[in-house]
């Protein structure tokens, strides 16, 4: 089954609640919430305070994509701020810490996933597959 998960990164943040409502009314299944720290990737985007506000504005499923260095440091905070699922880049930390981050998310009742950069071999996700959705 195909699911549609538009990223809110292109939204007008002054009108975020309204734009999320429009996305939901258009039939989106999830919201994709891109988090960039300027370290793991060159750009900087939104974070925990925006996620908390977004969670108050919608009951849609929110997939938080952490494009950040050492995501284990923030896994719990993003889960508690309103993420329904958190996806972690396997390149962002050691295998041990990515597994720990996945465990944190799952321990808080959230779904977890892993993602890779375009140039990373697909096989890099194999050690994590038993623990993710």
Which ranges hold each PLM region?
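Short gly/ser/thr-rich secondary-structure transition/capping motifs
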Residues: 115-119
